[in-house]
Every structure is written in C-alpha cells, then in structure tokens.
C-alpha cells in the first residue's frame, strides 16, 4: 500500500511527532479532512490519494464516536485502509453507510492515538510504513502575514495553491525551521517489517 500524507509543521513544536527521514520505519494512523460535503453513495468502495495528499473516497462507515472528541468522529474503511473523519455531519449517518467525499489525507493530529484508551472497542487504524520520500513545501509569500512579534499562515495548502518551485526534496526533516511550511510524506508498506515498530506519535 502506498500513500502520501501531509505532515504539518506544528507537530514538531507541539511534540506530537519527531522529524522524519527517508528510509525510516513508522507506525501511523491517519485523518481525512473533507473539502466537500460528505454524502451517501452507491459507488464501489475505493480510496485514491494523489501525490499532493488530496484524496477521494467511497468508504464504509464502521463505528461512530461522540466522545472524547468535540465533534462526531467516524471510522471509515476502504479495502485494507482505515482512517477517521471528524466532522459534524458524521451524526447524519449510521454504521454501515457507504459515504463518499474528497479531502486531504493527514497524519493523525492526536485525537485518535492519544485518546485511544477512551474509545470503546476501537478498530485498528495503525499501519507500519517506510518513509520513501519527503518533500518540504514552503508557503508562497501571499499566504504568510508577518507582524512584529508573530507570523501568521495556514498550516497547509491544496496542491493548486503552490508551484514546483515551492517544493524541496529532503532526506531528513532534521534541522528545518518548521515555520511557514508543511511536508508531503510518501509512504509504502512494501519491504518493511510489521513487527516491533513502535507508534511514531511521541505521546503514545
């Protein structure tokens, strides 16, 4: 299984994840943040993610959780891949519904991995991958607002909001500024041991 997911820079400052490097074995869970409406669908089950981490899916809703999250959280399954969506509209669906939408695939920001012990009978959302490629995306200046004591910017951009000149391939995230930038992480399950890889989230 191959995926590309967004790693937002604030994870480093908050101590959620360590800087990653190419070749590293990681154990991760994932979130999809929808960019459109979630709808019931009769489409065949699928999950496709592009190299900018933008994805489309038609996936089966497994459980729905209303605690400990502030918004309803639904676990979705498409073939061998499971992920969560945290969205108010999850309350409109029932377990077993097939739901389709588009969105961005991201590293779990902590709501699943950190509070795993609080979910009733949680399904396994963790996957062991090898990091195959790391791309740093520096936010174009029009998305960055600089003040005397602070810098404001979004945590990530869609693929159509930046250009090839904003992307830099890295062997390691060590030593980066983790400022107005985010990272596209290419992951692959092939050739990586599925045993003895601890969860990459530092608080787990």
Where are the predicted features?
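Short, structured beta-strand/loop micro-motifs enriched in basic residues and often containing a Trp
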Residues: 1-12, 78-84
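Long, compositionally biased, intrinsically disordered segments
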Residues: 1-3, 7, 18-27, 36-65, ...
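Short nucleic-acid-contacting surface segments enriched for D/E, G, S/T with interspersed K/R
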Residues: 13-28, 88-103
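Short, Lys/Arg- and Gly-enriched loop/turn segments at beta-strand edges
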Residues: 32-45, 107-117
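Structural detector for short beta-strands of small beta-barrel domains
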Residues: 44-71, 97-105, 120-175
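Eukaryotic intrinsically disordered, low-complexity regulatory regions
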Residues: 65, 74-100, 176
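Short aromatic-glycine-enriched beta-strand elements
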Residues: 68-76, 180-185
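Long terminal accessory segments
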Residues: 172-204
């Amino acid at each position: 299984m191959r995926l590309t997911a967004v790693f937002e820079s604030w994870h480093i400052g908050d101590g959620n994840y360590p800087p990653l490097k190419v070749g590293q074995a990681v154990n991760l869970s994932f979130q999809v943040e929808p960019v459109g409406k979630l709808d019931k669908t009769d489409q065949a089950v699928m999950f496709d993610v592009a190299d900018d981490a933008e994805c489309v899916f038609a996936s089966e809703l497994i459980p729905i959780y209303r605690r400990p999250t502030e918004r309803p959280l639904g676990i979705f399954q498409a073939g061998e891949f499971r992920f969560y969506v945290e969205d108010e509209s999850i309350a409109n669906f029932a377990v077993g519904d097939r739901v389709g939408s588009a969105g961005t695939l991201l590293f779990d920001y902590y709501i699943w991995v950190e509070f795993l012990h609080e979910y009733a009978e949680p399904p396994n959302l963790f996957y062991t991958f090898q990091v195959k490629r790391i791309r740093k995306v520096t936010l174009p200046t029009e998305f960055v607002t600089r003040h005397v004591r602070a810098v404001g910017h979004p945590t990530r951009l869609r693929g159509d909001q930046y250009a090839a000149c904003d992307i830099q391939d890295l062997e390691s995230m060590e030593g980066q500024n983790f400022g107005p930038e985010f990272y596209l992480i290419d992951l692959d399950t092939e050739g990586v041991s599925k045993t003895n890889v601890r969860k990459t989230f530092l608080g787990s």
